[in-house]
Amino acid sequence: MAIDGILKQGFITTSADKFLNWAKTGSMWPMTFGLACCAVEMMHAGAARYDLDQFGIIFRPSPRQSDLMIVAGTLCNKMAPALRKVYDQMPEPRWVVSMGSCANGGGYYHYSYSVVRGCDRIVPVDVYVPGCPPTAEALVYGLLQMQNKIRLTNTIAR
């Protein structure tokens, strides 16, 4: 009963939320889902010049080890089920960053019969990074915005 009273006041949950969100923002592990030319800029962001490791962002090869997916490039209808399957294999909580105008809304290939007009039709997207292709700086900015969004999210008391 004493714990319920403290939880109603919000002190313990607020402190635990802040700690958990701080830990999550300092250790984001993205799963790369490079589909087109935006993937080259994503690799550029992970290289020595921009060094995403300094933000605690380390690329992982497996969806079971990742909590963030970066969808970079044109998503075709045949690739959409694979994207959803990889997303479903990621542990909770999971987030998605849509990188480039093709992933955001189909881009140059918007009216093609074989292109999904935005990956948000397949998976829920948290941050959109515009550009064709977006620069590595834009991706870093988008990832920093993702960290801010995670920091402000309630984990325990929803």
Curated annotation (Swiss-Prot):
Cofactor-binding details, from the entry: Binds 1 [4Fe-4S] cluster.
Membrane topology: Peripheral membrane protein
Record-linked InterPro entries: NADH_UbQ_OxRdtase-like_20kDa, NADH_UQ_OxRdtase_20Kd_su
Annotated catalysed reactions: a quinone + NADH + 5 H(+)(in) = a quinol + NAD(+) + 4 H(+)(out)
Residues the record lists as binding [4Fe-4S] cluster: C37, C38, C102, C132
GO terms, molecular function: 4 iron, 4 sulfur cluster binding; iron ion binding; NADH dehydrogenase (ubiquinone) activity; NADH:ubiquinone reductase (non-electrogenic) activity; quinone binding
Location in the cell: Cell inner membrane
Entry's family note: Belongs to the complex I 20 kDa subunit family.
Protein name, as recorded: NADH-quinone oxidoreductase subunit B
Gene encoding the protein: nuoB
